[in-house]
From Swiss-Prot:
SUPFAM superfamilies: YktB/PF0168-like (SSF142913)
The species this protein was found in: Bacillus cereus (strain ATCC 14579 / DSM 31 / CCUG 7414 / JCM 2152 / NBRC 15305 / NCIMB 9373 / NCTC 2599 / NRRL B-3711)
Stated name of the protein: UPF0637 protein BC_3960
Source domain of life: Bacteria
Pfam families in the cross-refs: DUF1054
Family: Belongs to the UPF0637 family.
Amino acid sequence: MTIQTFKSTDFDVFTVDGLEERMSAIKTNIHPKLEALGEQFAEYLSKQTDENFFYHVAKHARRKVNPPNDTWVAFSTNKRGYKMLPHFQIGLWGTHAFIYFGLIYECPQKVETAHAFLEHLNDLKTNIPNDFVWSIDHTKPSVKLHKTLETEDLQKMIERLATVKKAELLVGIHISPEEFSAMTNEQFLAKIESTMQSLLPLYALCNR
């Protein structure tokens, strides 16, 4: 089955005014694609890890006034949710698509994971591809490009994950609407797969 992935025009959904109107546009235009990606890559991650992965499409159910500025599908080994676990994400902001692995503030494994990352700090600095980015807040689009970080910068972000209650750490790639215009469905799916391959060693560190 051929999955219809994102188009460059899908980013325009975040220009729709109003909570109900934007949510309707997201549910109509974006969620079916996230569902399809969820099915495919939950199976992919399950095969790669020998664990059962489940996908979770963001519902934005807590929003009562402000419309969402991003949306995503997340992958975890818990059928009921993902926020409490290290997890993968595929999603969209108005400015870019993203493919991430990370831990957000609800995850109780942050301290143990930070210690594991620090033990392999030099490996992370060397093995994470230069064009990958790091986020310390999943609710904001701003990131730090891996190739611009010194080892000490990476160390500080990881240490913060262990010491700050609301700290988060995600890593992966961004794809701009312009890049999407030049990509086929097959190229995008291959990009997701190669990105997840690069991130799976971090997942392994979380579960050693």
